[in-house]
Amino acid sequence: MSLSQPSTQSRVKVKSFLTGLQDDICKGLENIDGEGTFQEESWERPEGGGGRSRVMREGRIFEQGGVNFSEVHGEELPPSILNQRPEAKGHKWFATGTSMVLHPRNPYIPTVHLNYRYFEAGPVWWFGGGADLTPYYPYLKDTRHFHKIHQEACDSINPKLHKVFKPWCDEYFFLKHRNESRGVGGIFFDYQDGSGKLYKGQNPNGLSSIASKELGEYKLSWEDLFSLAKACGNAFLPSYIPIIEKRHNQTFSDRERNFQLYRRGRYVEFNLVWDRGTIFGLQTNGRTESILMSLPPLARWEYGFKAPPESRESLLTDVFTKPQEWFTDESLEEKCRPHHAVD
């Protein structure tokens, strides 16, 4: 397919995958929860398009979770897009995506986020997406498992991709005002149109940019990138379900619950201040309830809180909210072992 002439069939193929991904994820999550079910609400956008939002509340595992599909189009692009891709100015646009955020009740099960999307505006098109994990009481083995499954998905297309997408995730899901990562990362990519360098982010001196420069000019076809989105999207359930199976019966006290709610506050801060998807949705008159379904049902803030030294909570704030080389840094096991947080 020519970079300058994406066909209408492209939209059909992507929509079929994204709606199927929503179906598969919802089915898998309902199976593991055992009690909660997703309630669907279809919606239409007055300016063009619509979607279907699915939310689970008060399940056995999930306190709240949402899996949304949207397909929207319009005449004029919002500033959040034009700032990144000014060549799209003046073109009608089309955007579709499936996004998900899950907030488990048990503090030992991480919050998780996924989003895969496709965009067209005249001759301009791109894929974006990724998945990231946000633990509260982290385990090194869980973190490594999540990363391993997503690395294998990237490697199935090309083994060089993960070297760019892993640090890009660390870079994107970073709370600049807190100087900490939102979680332990995963993968992230955006503005992938098959041309130029893989990294198209905003930090020319970051690790992702450096890795991308080392690869040089990198050509990927539309089908390559579509296959990447499919491989990564289908990697989600195998990356997350085993963590639930291992942690959902762990007991917890008010201390763990309060710390979970406190750390959920960081999730709220990122999504409302930094997340480009939230900003794009609000700037294009998207469905507010669907856009903000990523927020947890409960969260708390505490002025000046610091985790006690050498505590289980400090393991999160001192180690797991900083970008790490999860497989090659041997010191991580030494840091986790005193807290019984390796396995």
UniProtKB/Swiss-Prot annotation:
GO terms assigned for molecular function: coproporphyrinogen oxidase activity; metal ion binding; protein homodimerization activity
Gene Ontology cellular component list: cytoplasm
Cofactor(s) of this protein:
a divalent metal cation
Biological process according to GO: chlorophyll biosynthetic process; protoporphyrinogen IX biosynthetic process
List the catalytic activities from the record. Answer: coproporphyrinogen III + O2 + 2 H(+) = protoporphyrinogen IX + 2 CO2 + 2 H2O
Q: Which UniProt keywords apply?
A: Chlorophyll biosynthesis, Cytoplasm, Heme biosynthesis, Metal-binding, Oxidoreductase, Porphyrin biosynthesis
What is the stated purpose of this protein? Answer: Involved in the heme and chlorophyll biosynthesis. Catalyzes the aerobic oxidative decarboxylation of propionate groups of rings A and B of coproporphyrinogen-III to yield the vinyl groups in protoporphyrinogen-IX.
The protein here is known as Oxygen-dependent coproporphyrinogen-III oxidase
**Species assigned in the record:** Prochlorococcus marinus (strain SARG / CCMP1375 / SS120)
